[in-house]
Regions:
Chain A
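ABC-family P-loop ATPase nucleotide-binding domain
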Residues: 1-13, 310-311
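ABC transporter nucleotide-binding domains
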Residues: 7, 14-207, 214
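Residues that form or flank phosphate/diphosphate-binding pockets in enzymes
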Residues: 72, 113, 216, 239, ...
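Conserved protein kinase catalytic domain
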Residues: 78, 119, 222, 304-305
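ABC transporter nucleotide-binding domain
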Residues: 176-265
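Short, charged/small-residue-rich alpha-helical element at the C-terminal edge
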Residues: 226-311
Length: 311, 376
């Protein structure tokens, strides 16, 4: 077992009845890394978290956290990790301060002892410390939950979809907090369904339906995108999507916010320019007058869409 | 230990901040006692009686007067015909009809006919036995009067009655008050409800809102989680025991004949059984609703029906009698009646105590074994 790896997973399988929640997952997460599990709902992220936090037993395969086996040494692992489940798992009828004090004592520590670690986060919710946790806004709940998960200075922090249901500003703030925690030497495993957050991680694993599609740095994943990516815009976007998909040279086309991302079957640089001009004529013939086509860099989401599981 | 105390404090916050829980905990004992004490009573009071008096002599008049004067009966009407009585039964105006044969006073052993509405068989049995008691008491008194008269005139030919007259003495509950029976029953019901229902719902709630996940991924031992969840309810059930005892003593005049300490000790033992049942339910149910449903069906119904609280166990089919042995409330109610009403000492209830203690041990072992240190 490699010492510089905080988390090792090899050949992990997990089924719920007939549903394959995880299929042959192997991952190594280095010490001090901010590692992201990226994938839509049902990708198996939560199951993976629960196996690593010793809450579920894998059907087969081996997993270790801090060099400790998740099945055999579950007690010691529970002492060393911090876990923030996907649901807002705090006591709604307890105040902010009572929640934090409670979790501190459960982990055999006090707020004062590790205050420096949570100060940056807790200071933002401290003005509301006598408020019931159930009455906090989504962003504040999330900060409180993070404070509670951090209060015992864990070696590894597991955050299961911490930004789901949180407003965009709070999400950015949250990732800034994770950066600061990483500087303190805490290994962080975080999952998110938002592809745009992937670039904030050191490395990411793209997951879908229980399979790990690709593991690399965000830049590394983007560099595997081999085709030319075009962003196409027009006034009538919906009709445009259908027409782009009907274009004979189209490889794939998806709606991405304000533009359609289009890849072409033609991969050679020389061939591409002629196909693009062919596309312009095609769209003009269809009656579009305001079409803009530009070449863009692929995002993680483009890469994710390109990584269709081989059916 | 600090962990445990902090956990306990948290549990009390949960209980005190939830108005519904507080209402159940504090108001229920009072409501049940008052309800059983005053509204739901199996005692016979003011039953409407009609009389068909075919002799209309001094004897029947005195018997009718006595019936009317008793608190059990109220004279509805003196009838002229049998048919009239049948009509009154059909209309539900009367529950009992007394028919005196002609020349009742002159024949010493003439039968009196009692007709009772037996739609409620228990009530009918009680009514007729009360009426019989009044009549036979009157007969006895007249007999002794006549004996006294014959004794005063020596050589008189008064006949001595050869009949055997039973002298009834009701032990432990001379006034035959229903409260003596239902107070132990209500205690069994409330302790079961608070300890089992509240504990199971409390634990399942943590599963439901997801905090159980966080607690499991903590250094806290599962056994402490269980203990901390159960302890507050044990404490609250003690408060309830005392409330019930005080209410029944001061409001319903039920005496506490035996030792109060012993009574509280058995109650704690029974509360432990209920707590363990609650733990067991919490390991089975995954939602609060399921926990409540299981508690109601598996615990409340047997306490109501199979514990002897409402229906006497001796009258049940053998299989139900056998089944009633695994209902903890049955043993608890027997023990409470022995101590509270009969005033017996600890030696008399060793059997009930050991059955309950055995149940605690088995349930603790099973539920701690079943308590999951993981999510599945």
């Amino acid at each position: 077992m490699n010492k510089s790896n905080t988390i090792n997973l090899s050949g992990i399988h997990k089924n719920y009845g007939k549903v394959n929640a995880l299929q042959d997952i192997s991952l190594d997460i280095k010490s001090g890394e901010l590692f992201g599990l990226i994938g839509p709902d049902g990708a198996g992220k939560t199951t993976l978290f629960r196996i690593l936090t010793t809450l579920l037993l894998p059907d087969s395969g081996k997993a270790s956290v801090c060099g400790l086996d998740v099945v055999r040494d579950y007690r010691e692992i529970r002492r060393r990790v911090g876990y923030m489940p996907g649901r807002f798992s705090l006591y709604q009828d307890l105040t902010v301060e009572e929640n934090l004090t409670f979790f501190a004592t459960v982990f055999n520590t006090t707020i004062e002892e590790n205050y420096d670690l949570i100060r940056d986060i807790y200071i933002q919710i401290e003005p509301f410390k006598t408020r019931k946790a159930g009455k906090l806004s989504g962003g504040m709940k999330q900060k409180l939950a993070l404070s509670c998960a951090l209060i015992h200075r864990p070696e590894v922090l597991f955050l299961d979809e911490p930004t789901t249901g949180v407003d965009p500003v709070s999400r950015v703030e949250f990732w800034d907090m994770l950066d600061r925690l990483k500087q303190q030497g805490i290994t962080i495993l975080v999952s998110t369904p938002y592809m745009d957050e992937a670039s904030r991680c050191d490395r990411i694993a793209l997951m879908r339906t229980g399979k790990c599609l690709s593991v690399d740095t965000p830049a590394g994943i983007r560099s595997t995108f081999s085709r030319l990516l075009l962003a196409v815009r027009s006034a009538s976007m919906y009709r445009l999507l259908e027409d782009l998909r009907a274009f004979p040279g189209t490889y794939s086309c998806y709606a991405f916010g304000d533009a359609h991302h289009l890849t072409l079957k033609e991969e050679s640089d020389a061939g591409v320019s002629s196909v693009v001009s062919g596309l312009e004529t095609y769209l003009q013939a269809k009656g579009y007058t305001d079409v803009s086509i530009e070449s863009i860099k692929p995002t993680i989401e483009d890469c994710f869409m390109a990584l269709q599981p081989e059916a | 230990m600090k962990q445990f105390i902090s956990f306990l404090r948290k549990e009390f916050y949960h209980i005190f901040r939830d108005k519904r829980t507080m209402l159940i905990l504090l108001a229920m004992p009072v409501i049940l006692i008052v309800l059983f004490g005053y509204a739901i009573t199996t005692e016979i009071k003011s039953v409407q009686v009609a009389v068909l008096d075919q002799s209309r002599d001094e004897a029947t008049t005195r018997i009718i007067d006595r019936i009317g004067a008793s608190e059990y009966f109220e004279l509805y009407k003196v009838l002229d015909s049998y048919e009239e009585g049948e009509a009154l039964f059909r209309q539900g105006k009367i529950r009992l009809l007394l028919v005196f044969p002609p020349r009742y006073a002159s024949s010493s052993d003439a039968p009196v006919q009692l007709l009772a509405d037996a739609t409620d068989p228990n009530e009918a049995t009680q009514i007729t036995s009360y009426a019989t008691a009044i009549i036979s008491q009157w007969k006895m008194e007249r007999q002794s009067e006549m004996n006294a008269v014959t004794a005063q005139s020596p050589g008189g030919n008064g006949q001595l009655s050869a009949g055997i007259t039973p002298v009834v003495h009701l032990l432990y509950n001379p006034l035959m008050k229903g409260a003596y029976n239902f107070v132990p029953g209500v205690m069994g019901l409330i302790l079961m409800l608070i300890c089992a229902l509240m504990t199971s719902v409390g634990i399942v709630k943590e599963k439901e809102i997801g905090t159980m996940e966080v607690l499991l991924v903590s250094p806290m031992k599962p056994i402490y989680i269980i203990l901390a969840k159960a302890a507050p309810y044990l404490l609250l059930s003690l408060v309830n025991i005392i409330t019930i005892l005080a209410l029944s003593y001061f409001l319903l005049d039920v005496p506490i004949a035996g030792s109060l300490t012993l009574l509280i000790a058995i109650s704690i033992l029974y509360a432990l059984v209920a707590l363990c049942l609650g733990l067991l339910i919490s390991t089975i149910a995954n939602t609060q609703q399921a926990a409540m449903l299981v508690s109601a069906v598996v615990l409340m119904l047997p306490v109501m029906l199979l514990s002897g609280m409402v229906f006497p166990i001796e009258n049940m089919p053998v299989i139900l009698q056998w089944l009633s042995n695994i209902v903890p409330a049955k043993w608890y109610i027997i023990a409470v009646k022995d101590v509270m009403i009969k005033g017996l000492s600890a030696g008399a209830i060793w059997k009930e105590v050991s059955v309950l203690a055995f149940m605690v041990v088995v349930l603790i072992v099973v539920s701690v074994k079943r308590f999951k240190i993981r999510l599945e």
